[in-house]
Regions:
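An N-terminally biased module of ancient metal coordination in phosphate/nucleic-acid-related enzymes
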Residues: 1-83, 376-377, 389-391, 398, ...
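Extended substrate/RNA-proximal surfaces in nucleic-acid metabolism proteins
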Residues: 4, 51-170
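Divalent metal-coordination and catalytic microenvironments
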Residues: 10, 44, 75, 91, ...
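Histidine-centered divalent metal-coordination motifs
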Residues: 10-14, 143, 201
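Histidine/acidic-residue-rich catalytic or RNA/ligand-binding cores of hydrolases
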Residues: 17-19, 51-53, 149-156, 204-216
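Short acidic/histidine-rich active-site segments
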Residues: 191-207
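Cys/His-rich short segments
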Residues: 237-305
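Low-complexity, acidic/Ser/Thr- and charged residue-rich accessory regions of DNA metabolism proteins
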Residues: 317-417
Length: 417
């Protein structure tokens, strides 16, 4: 049995559009360490300047992965690319040399590969998957259900997208608005390992690792990581951790401009045009999954690990203290004392006994407990607006749009304790 590695394999550097200028290796490593992540993707590794920065800042670890010397956080080269149908795919590579080689080959299909961290490629998903047959890498669709840039906004099945290169697909990244209960209602997806990743654009612990995968690896090497994702001996995925899907910003069908939410039939009747403001209505992940689902209920294959639903600690603290913003000084103070005392944000979120958290702050302990038990009330997100945690009273006023997700605790999920 190997050691556990909490891993976030999809994020972006400062060279992708709309990201924080603080997305540099030192800040990512510092944020990852505070969060409690052991392994993160570099993101954007086809970008030449970013690759040079990565080479400069990281050293090769004894098993061949990259390591940030100060924090000991491990990195693996990753990149997200956009194909000609605006579908996003995630690629995980063995080394910077492999990234260099892939950059050379994909340059022929891209005008912005040297300028944009998430390059656009003049090729289809099938052509990309086919080209990758000659490369050692892990490959799969990114945030598979989101309405703007995903495989299922464009196609009704993976086979439709990847065609005869279908066997090149190693995993499906679920995205923030979906979980394995959603995805396992589609039997085509049962054979794939699900990745839960943050797609972070800034290094703060409420972004980085807001979704992550817990791997068990015999050694922290690329080959063992690959074995874990392909479900071969040497490693395995033991846990997917992610946002409660209703908190994702594309969970419900909603107007992209004014955020008003619609039932699917209503949106169809309105021809996807918002009667309130004239904006475009975007199909929510939940409705898209319901369209694609061939199973009445999720049916998890034997290899599927448990899925733990959680949200960033700062958001729990802010809500527990009745503060409207997670950047409030008081939120940061409680966050710091919890993380200093118990090791990392992930430890506080899922491992530390509630009684010990109550010694720091009882209100936070109380709310965290209902999170772990899945009894918190949610106002679902949609149209680009994140969902929110709401009080019992607020939820009674809002029925039936909000609901209580129910989940078992981590100990129950993994049969521990
Ligand atoms: Zn993307
Ligand atoms: Zn609108």
């Amino acid at each position: 049995m190997g050691e556990q590695y909490d891993s976030d394999l999809h994020l972006h550097s400062q060279y992708s559009g709309g990201t924080s200028p603080r997305m540099v290796i030192r800040e990512i490593a510092r944020g990852a360490a505070k969060k409690g992540l052991d392994l993160v993707g570099t993101g954007d590794i086809l970008h030449p300047k970013w690759r040079r920065h990565v080479r400069r800042e990281l050293v090769e670890d004894e098993y061949g992965l990259l390591k940030e010397p100060k924090t000991g956080v491990l990195f693996v080269p990753t990149v997200e690319v956009e194909d000609e149908r605006r579908v996003h795919h995630l690629i995980i590579l063995p080394s910077l040399d492999h990234a260099e080689e892939l950059h050379g080959e994909l340059s022929r299909y891209s005008d912005d590969i040297d300028a944009e961290g998430r390059p656009h490629l003049r090729m289809t998903g099938a052509e990309l998957a086919d080209l990758l047959k000659d490369h050692d890498c892990l490959f799969g669709p990114a945030h598979a259900f989101v309405p703007w840039t995903s495989v299922f906004k464009e196609y009704d099945s993976l086979r439709e997208c990847y065609g005869s290169a279908m066997d090149r697909v190693d995993f499906v990244e679920l995205g923030l608005s979906a979980d394995s209960d959603y995805a396992d209602r589609i039997s085509e997806l049962h054979e794939y390992t699900f990745l839960t990743c943050s797609d972070a654009h800034s290094p703060y612990p409420h972004r980085l690792g807001r979704e992550f995968v817990r791997f068990e690896l015999e050694e922290p090497s690329y080959d063992v990581l690959k074995a874990a994702i392909r479900r071969k001996p040497g490693g395995r995925v033991v846990l997917n951790v992610g946002l409660i899907p209703e908190l994702g910003k594309y969970n419900r069908t909603a107007c992209a401009r004014c955020k008003r939410q619609f039932e699917l039939e209503e949106a169809e009747r309105l021809n996807w045009r918002c009667p309130e403001c004239g904006g475009t209505i975007k199909k929510g992940v939940r409705d898209r999954v319901l369209e694609l689902a061939d199973l009445e209920k999720p049916k998890h294959p034997n290899h599927r690990p448990p899925y733990l639903r959680i949200i960033p600690l700062a958001e729990i603290i802010a809500k527990a203290l009745g503060l409207s913003t997670i950047t409030a000084k008081k939120v940061r103070a409680v966050w710091n004392s919890l993380v200093r005392r118990f090791g990392s944000e992930i430890d506080v979120l899922i491992e530390t006994p509630i009684e010990e958290i109550a010694e720091v702050d009882e209100r936070v302990a109380e709310l965290l407990k209902s999170f772990r038990e899945g009894t918190v009330n949610i106002r679902p997100g949609g149209g680009g607006e994140y969902g929110k945690i709401i009080t019992e009273e607020e939820s009674e006023r809002e029925e039936p749009r909000s609901r209580k997700p129910v989940q078992r605790t981590l100990d129950e999920l993994i049969g521990r304790g």
